[in-house]
Swiss-Prot record:
It comes from Arabidopsis thaliana (Mouse-ear cress). This is GDP-mannose 4,6 dehydratase 2. Its cofactor is NADP(+). Keywords: GTP-binding, Lyase, NADP, Nucleotide-binding. Homotetramer. Binds to GER1. The lineage of its organism: Eukaryota, Viridiplantae, Streptophyta, Embryophyta, Tracheophyta.
Length: 373
């Protein structure tokens, strides 16, 4: 699916004949997204395409494509007039690939969403997490800076931060709240945050940090607790699973809808001056509350199915994250549209339908459900 498009910017700009009133249509803005195949990347791509952008995504080469979240908007690049999303091979661990594609694509905006983003996994692979999340951001910032110097162009940069950076700092957490990271992932995100601030202050780069609190959707990875719950719930409802094993049910998070949060990313890069913003719903809910709403929605009692497994507790727990997004609301004019219960039910609906399709395959003998508890 990835394309090697080495054309200049003029090749990818919209070329529209003047209308009768001689008004010339402005060229399309071009965005470059790392992590385009992830939850946030897919929603941001949809959002930017809706704004008339041409979107380029950087994807890693692997043994199989992980593009299911963007397949519905992919158009073969040979269809030049309609293919406004293009994919290219690159990696945040490879500085030369980042610089090469920025020079080729000539983006107006760069959104760095790629990461090893699982907190628990970061304890297992801390070196890799730091290389991708922290040093990867530094490589991309340097590629953008070098490109702007050589080309004389202005490129706006968005860095995806995380509420995990606050760690054990008491809520509510705002842009002025001190960081106290409690995992290799969170520490790496702190480094990326300060690299972004440094490049803004030292080189005048238009660079923003979005400190996003937990944001979920039906596209959330199945190894994250919210999606793990709704995925298991769907399978339990149709008889494919009997147990769900979880860790700390009292952990409280500020959960929003990922589709809402990508608008805030874009709004940050439309301001006159770059700055950092917390993006959150300003509501806190525990994992147990998520279980109450999700299982209750399907008429089930979660206590009949959930068991606690110590392996899912982190070496250093983060108990309570709840954001103060007043700055984003005031400056950006942003506010969340999807509330907690609506979000949970949205995810349950999608995963129930997925489980029903899965059951058809299991009943037909095309899948084996025995690996589930």
């Amino acid at each position: 699916m990835a394309s090697e498009n080495n054309g200049s910017r003029s090749d990818s700009e919209s070329i529209t004949a003047p209308k009768a009133d001689s008004t010339v249509v402005e060229p399309r803005k071009i965005a470059l997204i790392t992590g385009i195949t992830g939850q946030d990347g897919s929603y941001l791509t949809e959002f930017l395409l809706g704004k008339g952008y041409e979107v380029h995504g950087l994807i890693r080469r692997s043994s199989n494509f992980n593009t299911q979240r963007i397949n519905h908007i992919y158009i073969d690049p040979h269809n030049v007039n309609k293919a406004l999303m293009k994919l290219h091979y690159a990696d945040l661990t490879d500085a030369s690939s980042l610089r090469r594609w920025i020079d080729v694509i000539k983006p107006d905006e760069v959104y760095n969403l790629a990461a090893q983003s699982h907190v628990a996994v970061s304890f297992e692979i801390p070196d890799y997490t730091a290389d991708v999340v922290a040093t990867g951001a530094l490589r991309l910032l340097e590629a953008v800076r070098s490109h702007t110097i050589d080309s004389g162009r202005t490129v706006k940069y968005y860095q995806a931060g995380s509420s995990e950076m606050f760690g054990s700092t008491p809520p509510p957490q705002s842009e002025t709240t001190p960081f106290h990271p409690r995992s290799p992932y969170a520490a790496s995100k702190c480094a990326a945050h300060w690299y972004t601030v440094n490049y803004r202050e030292a080189y005048g780069l238009f660079a923003c940090n979005g400190i996003l609190f937990n944001h979920e959707s039906p596209r959330r990875g199945e190894n994250f607790v919210t999606r793990k719950i709704t995925r298991a719930l769907g399978r339990i409802k149709v008889g494919l699973q009997t147990k769900l094993f979880l860790g700390n049910l009292q952990a409280s998070r500020d959960w929003g809808f990922a589709g809402d949060y990508v608008e805030a990313m874009w709004l940050m890069l439309q301001q006159e001056k770059p700055d950092d913003y917390v993006v959150a719903t300003e509501e806190g809910h525990t994992v147990e509350e998520f279980l109450d709403v999700s299982f209750g929605y399907l008429g089930l009692n979660w206590k009949d199915y959930v068991e606690i497994d110590q392996r899912y507790f982190r070496p250093a727990e983060v108990d309570n994250l709840q954001g103060d997004a007043s700055k984003a609301k005031e400056v950006l004019g942003w506010k969340p549209q999807v509330g907690f219960e609506k979000l949970v039910k949205m995810m349950v609906d999608e995963d129930l339908e997925l489980a029903k399709r899965e059951k058809v395959l299991v009943d037909a003998g095309y899948m084996d459900a025995k690996q589930q508890p």
